[in-house]
């Protein structure tokens, strides 16, 4: 009887050969590219007079460096304009499908691919971006890769990788009202640590995961990399299939029937052998906020920032650095920390469901006069849907700036940046030093609903006070 995990099954299906040294050559089913990590890869192909091996398995969009305040061409930022033009040229030359600004389907690559039905169970997916693990929410195995591997996939449709171990993270019970997928994944990373996943794929499972919507599952898998894992995935189920059905790039008619039959066979066996199993009680998770300079440094809304004596020797070193950088003191409560900027968006939390929950918190309320707040839809499709539902007006009426799709302040490669030592309440995925554009800017990660609550009060707040 088979004892394979979904990871084992997908890996073996895509294994081309065993390479000298013990790594495997893995076929990539879908290659996603964008304007930042692809130019050098295309340049390397040109230097060797090579073509893209399977252009029909490659899809491009622009997201990282695009402005969100004004997307009229040419951009004011000459570098951004040059990078977009380069991607346009490369896609045209190699006959690659490209979702450009104004196509109706442009946006953050990890938002666009699922909403178009490109992301499907059983796939191997690669992209020159660390949050490619997002696509594992559909039962695919998705890896972030570097520019040299982007080159390899363009040229051969394969990459060389060592097979990962698999850790199952079993989440019992279900999340309480006012607690979201972002809170759960921050809690998981805090419990396990930011390096615990090195060499692992994370399989998220259990009743709490089953309860989540597909967009919430994407949030969980998106931040696998923040826990050190190369990828994270969830076994596909009826929610998965319903989400994909009738999407623009989903299989149609008899091809859908064939795909569905295969997808239903793709799950970890009941007696799968895991390299490690972790069990957590999701019902005990509360709204969670990061206080430090790694996503693992988080606490519940009513908790105090840890004392040094309560930390391990390794954690003490990072904590001391975080106290100084963030201007926090050990034992200080995170609640009521003043914030200067509130950002809702990113590939972690820039989807329509994220905007809906934030809008519910903001409706008939006003952003604090001391706060600059802006919302950046994850894609043109998300923006269109939000406008049809009137969400954009709720945001604007409250005092949020409504922006155009892009990665924006998640990594601050455009003009959306913190200034000086501003404190940001952010729905993004990383709180490293300088991550949001200012060398001394400070980032507090939280759910979109928590960002909305912080925007109203001008300080870190418990969103349950707004929705219960």
Curated annotation (Swiss-Prot):
The keyword Transmembrane helix does not apply. Disulfide bonds: none annotated. Its cofactor is [4Fe-4S] cluster. GO terms for biological process: L-leucine biosynthetic process. Binds 1 [4Fe-4S] cluster per subunit. The keyword rRNA processing does not apply. [4Fe-4S] cluster binds at residues 347, 407, 410. CDD domains: IPMI (cd01583). Its EC number is 4.2.1.33. Keywords: 4Fe-4S, Amino-acid biosynthesis, Branched-chain amino acid biosynthesis, Iron, Iron-sulfur, Leucine biosynthesis, Lyase, Metal-binding. GO terms for molecular function: 3-isopropylmalate dehydratase activity; 4 iron, 4 sulfur cluster binding; metal ion binding. NCBIfam families: leuC, PRK05478.1, PRK12466.1. Catalyzes the isomerization between 2-isopropylmalate and 3-isopropylmalate, via the formation of 2-isopropylmaleate. Belongs to the aconitase/IPM isomerase family. LeuC type 1 subfamily. Heterodimer of LeuC and LeuD. This is 3-isopropylmalate dehydratase large subunit.
